[in-house]
Amino acid sequence: MSSQSAYQLPISFRKSNQLSFAPAVRQYISNKYDQHPDMFRQDIEVIDALRRDAINVREPHTSGIRKLQAYAAQLVWISGKFPIDIGADFTWYPALGYNTDRPLVQNNLQYELLNVLYNLAALYCQLALSTNSNGDSNAIKTAANYFSHAAGVLSHMKTAVLPELRMPSPPEDMDEATLESLEQLMLAQCQECYWQKAVAEGYKDATIAKLAARASDLYNSAAEAAMKSEAISSAWIHHISAKHHHFAAAAQYRASLDCLEKRKYGEEIARLQDAVACANEGLREARGGYLKEGVAEDLRRLKMRAEEDLKRAEHDNDMLYLLPVPTKPELKILDRANLAVARIPAQVSAPVDHIGDEAEFGPALFSKLVPYAVHMAVSIYEERRDRLVNNNIIHELEVLTERMHEILSSLNLPGSLQALEKPLGLPGPLIQHAEEIRQADGINRIQRSFADIDKLRSSDIAVFEEGKSLLVTEEEEDQRLRRRHGTQRWARPESRQDPAGGQKLWAQVGEIEGYFASSTSSDGIVREKYLAIEDTLMVLSGSDRSLMDFVPSSRRTEIPESVKPALGRLRGAYNDVLRMESRRRKRVEALRERARSDDIKPDILRETGRLERAYPGTTLAAAHFDDFFERRLDSLYEDDLALLERETAEQEKCLNEVSRVNREFESQRRAAGADKAGGKEREAALQKLDSAFYKYKEIVSNVEVGRKFYNDLSKIVGTFRDTCRTWVAERRKDARSLEDEISMPPLGSLSLQQTPSQQSSQYYSQQQQQQPRSPPQEAHHSAYADTGSMPPQQPRPLPAANAQQTWSQNMPIQFGGPPGTAQQTQPAQAGAKKPVGGTWDPSAGIRFG
């Protein structure tokens, strides 16, 4: 029996980036700390070691179970001591869906826990698949146990962790529908293991039918949940649906064998008919090439066996038994035997019980930490390597190829050759080009790519606009407060001149807007390219008949003898160009593969050890590896850089030869009159189709570059938005502190005769009235000045009704009278003593005598 593990679906691991945690009493930013072991506290070392171990689990080995469980348990433990937004930005790449290269960054402990548990479920799943590859009974039982634990972990994530996530929306590949689908899939594959074991050990057909029926139910539940998920791919949905129909057919087939044994010949026929129908339904899922060949082949074999038995059963029943065949609604529904149960490991359901000095997941599992600068250096090297390979080598080679095709197109090649060599029908290269576009679903592929790019650009713009709006709002708030309090008192830099972040952020606004402007222009150019060839691509992606209708036949079917020598030389020169292009394409693919396999980690760790020995006590930084990077890049890619010069020279030589031979060919063709008799129209049509094909290849390359650009830009705008949030929060906090400082009453306004409540009332009265008189500071000074030195103010004429408001020595002192009365008060006893000029202002305090 072939192993079923090859036909079961694995859950892939989610990938993450390195970071460090914060101590219990403060937030700790991953890119601000020094990773030298002597400078870390023990708890930081422990949690960093646990996380590093957990995120590096990438292979189905049992040692990874403890690593993931220990880290998950530690996360649960520290979530009781720290807030959920601990201050560490956890970056994880999705494992499902169509954005697996686009990470999601969250400052959220529950998000980190959800990812770690997801990887634990993936590990259980992959262990099940690797264990079941042997096919023996004990291995199958162990695989079923692993699938059961995978389902249990997914169930725990869905019911215990996801509700506590505290995010606006969960990641699309870990939402409730996706987790439900994965849980049901794990249970289905667990049930399939028990079914496989029963078949291998020769259980009764009735028992095997019950096991298969339950497996079919579980696959159906997984498919229904997958339809509600945005992350489960179409290929997975087709696979799961096919397995649902497969096990439904297998259940009915085994039930038919049981009926045969019990001499229920009519029911046997009905169940065989249903088995064939279910197998046909499963085979429909194979359309479009979604299924693995082994899955489809199993369905075909099952269908063939059921059809053979059905033919035999119908013949026997018609000739011998003559029993009625029940309809499908009349058939008794098969019983189910459910052996697949979601079992949550105790280390996951009660993790804190396994933490402690003497417990299973004790602290200080690892003491050695790799400096963070090394991880940064690896990223810097990979960025430099990719820039060197993609921009300096591959891009230049692609430019050479594009220039080559432009020159060939200007020479009407290969159209002029094909029109003369094959005056009737379709040339072979054209048929190959058309088939390639059809197989790739070229037009829909480009349109989907355009839609993806639009979606990515809109998402990036939305994130950027969110950050920019924060800056604009903060600037408006700052200007409003500056106008309210005055420039002298609002003594802090304006938003765009703030050296603490405003200058850099507003400069980034211009840079990112420039990115969007240039990318929008590039997108427009690519779309114009596509629109220019869309009609021709429609012809290429159509049938051969439509191609033949597009390409007219030449009325001359024989090549003139005088043209044949020049034609042969031109064909040879053109073939040299094609061979050169083919060699170049293979070299580019080999270079890409070499760059992908260029793993610097072992070498950079050795270089780290050398630097630490050479410079003891020095904190390593990424800049220390610059010379090492240069030496490595030169040794690995110097020959490829030299290849550019050779390719340029070779192409120039080949194209010069093609141009020379083409002139001879055109001259001979005109002399022989071979460019007439319908040849020009055929040549133009063939050339148009050939040019459209190479433009199509160019557009496909362009849209892939565009997609990568917007994915990379999403990281930039995401960091920009998060930095804006932090900076704006700090500016607002600073503004509140400055406003509180300004709101404190000046010392000159305090008087020993006033109670604190009177002083406060006086101050706020000043702030609210904003009288167009001397500033409060001047009024306070005048209250303590020599009265003889003050020039008398001209008393304001008062109406009689207000005379009673004038203060005299025989009247009590009144504060804050009706509006307008305080400013009109003047001394009434002018003759009793020398009057002091000025009207009384509450803001000036009280002056006696």
From Swiss-Prot:
Domain BRO1: 7-404
Subunit description: Interacts with RIM101 by binding to its two YPX[LI] motifs.
SMART domains assigned to the protein according to its UniProt record, in alphabetical order: BRO1
Natural source organism: Pyricularia oryzae (strain 70-15 / ATCC MYA-4617 / FGSC 8958) (Rice blast fungus)
The family this protein is said to belong to: Belongs to the palA/RIM20 family.
Keyword Coiled coil: yes
GO cellular component, one term: endosome
Native organism taxonomy: Eukaryota, Fungi, Dikarya, Ascomycota, Pezizomycotina
Start-end of Polar residues biased regions: 802-812
Gene3D superfamilies cross-referenced by the UniProt entry: alix/aip1 in complex with the ypdl late domain, alix/aip1 like domains
Region described as Disordered: 475-502, 738-849
Alphabetical UniProt keywords: Coiled coil
Coiled-coil intervals, chain numbering: 260-321
Compositionally biased spans, kind Low complexity: 745-772, 820-835
Full protein name: pH-response regulator protein palA/RIM20
InterPro entries in UniProt: ALIX_V_dom, BRO1_dom, BRO1_sf
Job description of the protein: Required for the proteolytic cleavage of the transcription factor RIM101 in response to alkaline ambient pH. May act as a scaffold protein that recruits the calpain-like protease RIM13 via VPS32 to its substrate RIM101.
